[in-house]
A protein has these predicted regions:
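Low-complexity, Ser/Thr/Pro/Gly-enriched N-terminal "stalk/linker" regions
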Residues: 1-92, 115
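The feature captures the catalytic groove of carbohydrate-active enzymes
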Residues: 3-28, 86, 127, 131-155, ...
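Well-ordered alpha-helical scaffold segments within catalytic/enzyme domains
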Residues: 40-51, 98-110, 155-172, 233-251
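Active-site acid/base region of carbohydrate-active enzymes
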Residues: 43-68, 107, 120, 125-129, ...
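Alpha-helical scaffold segments that form or flank carboxylate-/histidine-based iron centers
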Residues: 86-87, 91, 96-100, 171-173, ...
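C-terminal capping/lid segments that line or modulate ligand- or cofactor-binding pockets
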Residues: 89-92, 146-152, 156-166
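Alpha-helical support elements that line or immediately flank enzyme active sites
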Residues: 90-124
Length: 256
């Protein structure tokens, strides 16, 4: 049943000291009023492409939809920053947010799309776990931590690094780094097989229509006792990025 698992109510055996560095948990919410599309349209990047009106109309419609699906923190959901919603089922999603943030960066001076991730960090568990899907109404995790569909893919580090390369915000990088390390450590401990390879699920990897599983397994929820090559590559990419972050921040204590 959706929404029955609350952050940090379980007894865990692997609590991370890094969580003490997570400044998003319990932070004062940012209640800055949301921008309205009609007020900021002229401040958005203005494409010039002669004889391609349909493409330009699509471009502007994408921005209109984006700014029409922004949300704010509430007392009930425990969010700390305004965010872009996936416009799907009243939840924020780790995977969807990462890709929306990738185009949202072109409007960063208007709205901090990157702050969508703040709400995932604010709901990080004491052992490093972050649920990939969080209810916007009450802030509850939709999945329990050890459900194969509970989290992933590990793409937040990739997105945060891309923002750093674009904007050079070292203060932001330093703030999110312990959250990302703790999350990676959780994934390494709980979503791997004995040989160090990773598993996931259709929902967990973001490709819930990929026909890779034997028909006896659920395509969305099961790991099928398989090694998931995309999950392995996502983790490799995350590790490489976390190493780059550690070099920038001078925090090599996490590098083997």
């Amino acid at each position: 049943m959706a929404g029955i698992f609350r952050q940090n109510t379980e007894i865990t055996y692997d609590d991370k000291d890094l969580i003490e560095e997570n400044t998003f948990i319990g932070a004062e919410p940012d209640m800055t009023p949301l921008p309205k599309y009609e007020d900021i349209k002229n401040d958005l990047p203005q494409p010039v492409w002669d004889n391609h009106k349909d493409y330009l109309d699509c471009y502007w419609k994408a921005w209109e939809i984006a700014f029409g699906n922004l949300g704010m923190p509430t007392k009930e959901n425990g969010f700390v920053s305004s965010y872009i919603d996936a416009a799907f089922n009243g939840c924020i999603f780790m995977w969807d947010s990462a890709f929306m943030l990738m185009f949202g960066k072109y409007a960063d001076r208007i709205f901090k799309f990157q702050s969508t991730f703040d709400n995932f960090y604010a709901h990080q568990h004491v052992d490093g776990f972050i649920c990939r899907q969080i209810d916007e109404e009450d802030g509850k995790d939709i999945f329990a931590r050890h459900d194969p569909a509970s989290t992933g893919p590990e793409v937040m580090a990739w997105c945060e690094w891309d923002y750093f390369l674009n904007f050079g915000d070292k203060e932001r990088l330093a703030r999110v780094f312990p959250c990302l390390i703790a999350y990676h450590q959780w994934m390494q401990e709980h979503f791997t097989w004995r040989d160090g390879t990773y598993f996931s699920s259709g929902y967990g990897c973001g490709m819930d229509n990929c026909p890779r599983l034997d028909e006896k397994y659920h395509i969305c929820y099961s790991h099928g006792h398989m090694i998931w090559v995309d999950a392995c590559m996502q983790e490799l990419n995350a590790c490489n990025i976390l190493i780059k972050m550690s070099e920038v921040l001078g925090r090599d204590e996490f590098v083997p």
